[in-house]
């Protein structure tokens, strides 16, 4: 019994492999394009053209996804712009206040 190796040693003490696992594969259409060339797009007149334009707007790389939030369900939601508050613009209603006080 002392010469046998415990099952927990076989499970937890394995050496890690030096080669990393491939998490995803690059599709052939993207592998063939070089540099900043745009990937081929589907027909603009197709039924999903509205969806594709919205998706391109969301995935626009110039904004780096700062205006997009991913919900717990995995859907992309666009963040709404926050309006300026009175603390940021204290002189916003000064003209209106002066008009009332002169009456």
From Swiss-Prot:
Highest taxon of the lineage: Eukaryota
Region (Disordered): 28-103
Composition skew (Basic and acidic residues), residue ranges: 53-63, 93-103
Disulfide bonds: none
One Pfam family cited in the UniProt record for this chain: ATAD4
Segments forming a coiled coil: none
Family: Belongs to the PRR15 family.
PANTHER family: PROLINE-RICH PROTEIN 15-LIKE PROTEIN, PTHR14581
Entry protein name: Proline-rich protein 15-like protein
